[in-house]
């Protein structure tokens, strides 16, 4: 089931790239914009799910240790406070999207934020570390 879901995003990327190429050759600007939007959606779905699959573990997880644990304590005050903020980000999404813990490479700190839909709307300089799929199918 999951591999079919993810494969649909990859197929969507390939289709959008082919249609985008054709639209550019024809100079069809409306089709260019439509296929750029479709490409962003499907590429976002592929990237988001690629991160998501790596976040999952058959044995569940536990609190982080090492540098990540220290950064969470420093940025959020404690793991429990981080967990509360991350849960609020996930539950506060209106519609479909993702809750994300990311490392801000410019500010050099951890942030939680929401992604709406799939369009890979990760702020510049952010490296996603943890994502939770909050789409209705999840």
From Swiss-Prot:
What's an example of a GO molecular-function annotation for this chain?
Answer: superoxide dismutase activity
Q: Name one Pfam family in it.
A: Sod_Fe_C
Would I find Metal-binding among this entry's keywords? yes
What residues bind Mn(2+), as annotated? 1, 49, 133, 137
Q: Which UniProt keywords apply?
A: Manganese, Metal-binding, Oxidoreductase
Q: Which reaction does it catalyse?
A: 2 superoxide + 2 H(+) = H2O2 + O2
Cofactor note from UniProt?
Binds 1 Mn(2+) ion per subunit.
Q: Does the keyword ATP-binding apply?
A: no
Could you say which cofactors this protein requires?
Answer: Mn(2+)
Q: Which EC class heads this enzyme's classification?
A: oxidoreductase
Give the enzyme's EC designation. Answer: 1.15.1.1
Function summary: Destroys superoxide anion radicals which are normally produced within the cells and which are toxic to biological systems.
The cross-references to PANTHER family, in alphabetical order and at most eight, read: SUPEROXIDE DISMUTASE 2 (PTHR11404), SUPEROXIDE DISMUTASE [MN], MITOCHONDRIAL (PTHR11404:SF6)
* Protein family (similarity comment): Belongs to the iron/manganese superoxide dismutase family.
Q: What is this protein called?
A: Superoxide dismutase [Mn]
């Amino acid at each position: 089931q999951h591999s079919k879901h993810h494969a649909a995003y990859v197929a969507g990327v390939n289709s959008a790239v082919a249609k985008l190429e054709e639209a550019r050759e024809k100079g069809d600007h409306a089709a260019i914009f439509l296929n750029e939007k479709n490409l962003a959606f499907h590429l976002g779905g592929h990237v988001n799910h690629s991160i998501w699959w790596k976040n999952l573990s058959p044995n569940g997880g536990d609190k982080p240790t090492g540098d990540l644990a220290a950064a969470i304590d420093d940025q959020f005050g404690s793991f429990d406070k981080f967990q509360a903020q991350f849960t609020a980000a996930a539950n506060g999404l209106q519609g479909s999207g993702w809750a994300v813990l990311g490392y801000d490479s410019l500010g050099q700190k951890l942030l939680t934020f929401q992604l709406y839909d799939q369009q890979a709307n990760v702020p510049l300089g952010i490296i996603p570390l943890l994502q939770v799929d909050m789409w209705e199918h999840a």
